[in-house]
Design a protein with these regions (language model features):
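Membrane-interface loop-to-helix entry segments
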Residues: 52, 105-112
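Membrane-water interface at the C-terminal end of transmembrane alpha helices
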Residues: 112-134
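Membrane-embedded alpha-helical transmembrane segments of multi-pass integral membrane proteins
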Residues: 12-22, 57-61, 80-90, 109-119
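Membrane-helix boundary connector in multi-pass membrane proteins
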Residues: 73, 86-106
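Hydrophobic transmembrane helix segments
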Residues: 12-46, 53
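Transmembrane helix-loop junctions in multipass membrane proteins, especially transporters and channels
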Residues: 24, 28-31, 70, 93-100, ...
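Juxtamembrane helix-break-helix junctions at the cytosolic face
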Residues: 56-75
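Cytosolic juxtamembrane helix and N-cap/initiation of the first transmembrane helix
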Residues: 1-15
Length: 134
């Protein structure tokens, strides 16, 4: 189960990265980025720090999923998964302009992976949690 959860976090990181890479091909996007903003949102130090924390979490969850004891592992995955879903919902209200189809496709895949992470962690066999936490 630990390896499976770690693999889901790795897949999620790839989706985040490729989604951002594809956005560079949108007309005018690179110009906005070099001017310090995107879709009406200006890049301040707090915004970029928040983005760094947000993007560091899946990488840390790969490590934590592989190394934490079962009980801690289970809750770390549930909490991190819910947090990322809330962020995904929150991003629907940020920015200006139309969202491109590829972006929505990646968001759907991200949501599916996050729900699967939560489901796997939630359904972690209870007898194994009791046995492995001793």
């Amino acid at each position: 189960m630990k390896v499976k959860l770690a693999l889901f976090w790795i897949a999620l990181m790839f989706l985040y990265i490729y989604n951002d890479i594809l956005s560079l091909y949108q007309p005018g996007h690179v110009a906005e980025l070099t001017e310090g903003h995107s879709q009406g949102m200006y890049f301040t130090q707090p915004i970029l720090f928040g983005a760094a924390v947000l993007m560091a979490l899946p990488g840390l969850m790969v490590l934590l999923s592989a190394t934490l004891k079962v009980r801690s592992n289970r809750w770390a995955n549930i909490i991190a998964g819910i947090f990322h879903i809330l962020v995904l919902i929150g991003t629907q209200f940020i920015g200006e302009g139309d969202t491109w189809l590829y972006w929505r496709f990646y968001e759907l895949l991200e949501l599916i992976l996050l729900l699967q992470i939560i489901r796997l962690a939630w359904r972690w066999p209870q007898h194994r949690i009791l046995m492995m936490s001793k």
